Amino acid sequence: MPLQNSTLTDQSIVTGLRGEAAGWRWDASLNYGSNKFELDLDNTVNQSLGANSPTHFYAGSLKNEQTVFNLDAAREFPVSYFTGPLTVAVGAEARHEKYSIGAGDAASYTGGGSQGFAGFRPVNAGSHSRHNESIYVNLEAEATKKLSGGVALRHERYSDFGSTTSAKGSARYAFTDALSLRGTVSSGFRAPSLAQQYYTITTTNFQVINGNNTAIETGTFAVNTPQARALGAQDLKPEKARNYSLGLQFQPNRNFTTSIDAYRIDIDNRILFSANLALNDKLKAQLATQGSTVGAARYFTNAVDTRTEGVDIVSTYRIDLQDKDRLDLTVAYNHNKSTVQKIADNPAILTANNLKLIDRQSIDRITVASPKDKFSLAADYGFGIWNVHGLVTRYGSFTVPQNDVKLDQTYDPQWVLDVSGSVKLGKNWRLVAGIDNVTNRYPAQVTSNGNLNVNGTQPYSIFAPNGFNGRYYYAKAGYSW
């Protein structure tokens, strides 16, 4: 079977200055980071090349770069009718983003391309960038001994999506020293990422046809390409969100804390991949005139409005032991539910060809493809220069959906154990070693014909929340000053 050998390179550097001036505390920083993904394939061929096909291919690269300059300043001002000072924080930020696609070698994309993953073609390759600037202000104060709160405003200007203003308000009321109520209301804005705007590739995907997965040459097209426009694509719009939360905190003493928080998140114009659009002969011919010989197509679109509601419960208990040893116990539980509030109108060209931009599978991946429940129990034991950490997590059941409900597959809950230990060496060094998924648990294997298995070569679902790679060992060293 084809073997994908990927190389991932992360780079980052941060520098900054901080100080005080005229009663203000200020902090300036400059941050550069990049992530590059390069893909090689082995043990595969390009059937279009026949006997001349190599068995190793370089399929190309994806690279994200980001440079951020940030300047913050804060100070306190006395207010006679408040029990505490008014804290004022202001700031400005400038950000530059760049997204690049690098072409693979010619053998990886010629004809049908290398099996398993066709390389990025020269027509896919290119670099795209944008910049945005923002200013913000945050005010916080303790109005009375029981009531405190804050408000914040942020204004941003994107070079490709114009300007927006978001806001946040929060408040906390202490009924007693041990019991308090807190709440937050905020708005959010997320411009489509550069990858969502410009990612494009032609490769082999699998689509359920007559109840079985069938390999189809599939084009993923950027929304501004002629191919996507021919299938009804429109310019992407920013996602807009509204967030609400309300919670109780109970802390009867310094060693025990419990919090219960309910939340709701509404997202308008949520960006998803369209359905894999199986093209008829007419649409195939139309895309062929634009240089794309494919049997299916997809593109990013503002597909749906969604609502996520849930509750988080977290309890922590600290046990002070002899000789300054300490044991921290944490129990956490999350329950959530996501629903689709609105579905984007189907483009006329798709309706005329009996296709749906957003199908059942696209919707149910939002609503049922992630566990609705997650429970965890963590223990941290610190003694001297040593620390031991253990975490048990239970992921709830989830369903991998298909357009035919009879092909859905539901997976049972699963428990996972992670452990790690660390030691501090001197003032600056810390060594860490650990094992994730100690008991080597795997999710249930794929049984539905509709859920990608490919004759047993891919036996586990990519939707499994704990992955499908089994036990994992790691070690790392850190130096701080």
List the model feature ranges, each with a label.
Residues M1-L3, N52-S61, F120-A125, A152-R157, ...:
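Extracellular loop and loop/strand-boundary signature of outer-membrane beta-barrel proteins
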Residues I267, K337, V392-P401, S422-W481:
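C-terminal beta-signal and adjacent terminal beta-strands/loops
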